[in-house]
Amino acid sequence: MSGATKDVKKVVLAYSGGLDTSVILKWLQETYGCEVVTFTADLGQGEELEPARKKAEMLGVKEIYIEDLREEFVRDFVFPMFRANAVYEGVYLLGTSIARPLIAKRQIEIARQTGADAVCHGSTGKGNDQVRFELGYAALNPEIKIIAPWREWDLTSRTKLIEFAEKHQIPIAKDKRGEAPFSVDANLLHISAEGKVLEDPADEAPEYVYSRSVRPEDAPDTPTYVEVGFEKGDAVSIDGVKMSPATLLTKLNELGGANGIGRLDLVENRFVGMKSRGVYETPGGTVLLVAHRAMESITLDRGAAHLKDELMPRYAELIYNGFWWSPEREMLQALIDKSQEMVTGSVRLKLYKGMATVVGRSSPYSLYSMAHVTFEEDAGAYDQKDAAGFIRLNALRLRLLAARNNRTKK
């Protein structure tokens, strides 16, 4: 342990009440001899959080923070990301990545309120979350001390963690099969599972891994129709009923999950260099992404839409890698938000056996002109003869290139 960390007096621990952070809590007390403040964020993970309070109290914690951050999470983090249609490596909707900036922000704020001189997270030394948390800490308080137990202790596996917990009589949660659980991350946007039988990417994930969606094959035989209303790029209503951001995403999760939507078995490239396999469920987010892209399809100019599509992978990578608080992410966000000024209207979708299909879209700011696109008489809205000059000018460079090539062949 370095001298810079020996003098820690009080630390704010991002605490879920699960195996890892409960072991970390006890380890901090034993190793650092410091006061521990626990912070548990309700991001819509769908589990009772009072057990986390009771476990922290059992371990002697005096200052316990449990906060409902669901509305802030969706309003200030999920929705801005969805304005960008952000998807990492073509498929991942960034459910874990987008939660870390908010948790880091509140840890730093609580540290300031309580006079803590350090923060601590439970991320492993192999994963992305250690980077995401610590980049957030650095951006929000570069002077704060950071404790990353997985990079310090000799508990190098989940088996050793369980042994430590049993030795110190720390209760261990079991899954519905009576086993120690997968490594799970959950919030209102998604739930993910890693580890155990999922570590071999050649093996199909067993059905018991899934918890937020039915098997597409078992979904209702009758499709569900839903209309999502948008204002300036953000979803604001379902079937005409205005809802808060968190309430709306909760409802989309229910509708999507009931129809088997949002399942993903993914091998991704971690920022730290290795590949990892995880199983994700993002039912509401999947529906929301399809709806938002459909809303943009009639309200965004072609040039703006194509530029957004070009920038999206970079934006998604910034979030995945933990650079939410970076100036480049904020610059891109300003551009994206500007593009959303007219993204207002409604999208109708059919949810059926794992698919969310757009069946209608409308907007008071639509750029779709039936008068121009019709196959019937357009009453002079578009002169098809104009296309000849348009094509001739666009073909000029190709004709010049062909002429040069023909000359050089002789």
Curated annotation (Swiss-Prot):
Keywords: Amino-acid biosynthesis, Arginine biosynthesis, ATP-binding, Cytoplasm, Ligase, Nucleotide-binding. Its EC number is 6.3.4.5. Pathway: Amino-acid biosynthesis; L-arginine biosynthesis; L-arginine from L-ornithine and carbamoyl phosphate: step 2/3. L-aspartate binds at T124, N128, D129. It is an enzyme of class 6 (ligase). GO terms for biological process: argininosuccinate metabolic process; L-arginine biosynthetic process; urea cycle. ATP binds at A14, Y15, S16, G17, G18, L19, D20, T21, S22, A41, G122. GO terms for cellular component: cytoplasm. InterPro entries: Arginosuc_syn_C, Arginosuc_syn_N, Arginosuc_synth, Arginosuc_synth_CS, Arginosuc_synth_type_1_subfam, AS_cat/multimer_dom_body, Rossmann-like_a/b/a_fold. Belongs to the argininosuccinate synthase family. Type 1 subfamily. Homotetramer. This is Argininosuccinate synthase. It comes from Parvibaculum lavamentivorans (strain DS-1 / DSM 13023 / NCIMB 13966). The lineage of its organism: Bacteria, Pseudomonadati, Pseudomonadota, Alphaproteobacteria, Hyphomicrobiales. The gene is argG.
